[in-house]
Amino acid sequence: MTLLAKGGKMITEIGITAGDIWHYLDHHGDVTFTQLAQAIDMPKDLIFMSLGWLAREGHIILNKEADNYKISLRRS
């Protein structure tokens, strides 16, 4: 498999996981990263990449709280 093919697959996985996160937040409201990681049941690095995607696109708000992060959807 070429690097491009690997990268395309990874982008797809990040996008799908970002969608799962968005739907979870839409149904459950504000959650901590720990709660989200348990609910989504994907590798943490993939969840972090997907959160980065959503944050960069302006879809979520991340706030550091002690040793965790609070995550919520940005409601316009």
How would you name each of these model-derived features?
Residues 3-18, 32, 64-76:
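Short, cationic-aromatic polyanion-contact patches
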Residues 14-39:
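Short amphipathic alpha-helical interface segments
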Residues 26, 52, 56:
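Residue-level detection of the helix-turn-helix DNA-binding "recognition helix"
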Residues 42-53:
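Short amphipathic alpha-helical interaction segments
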Residues 55-65:
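A short, conserved structural fragment
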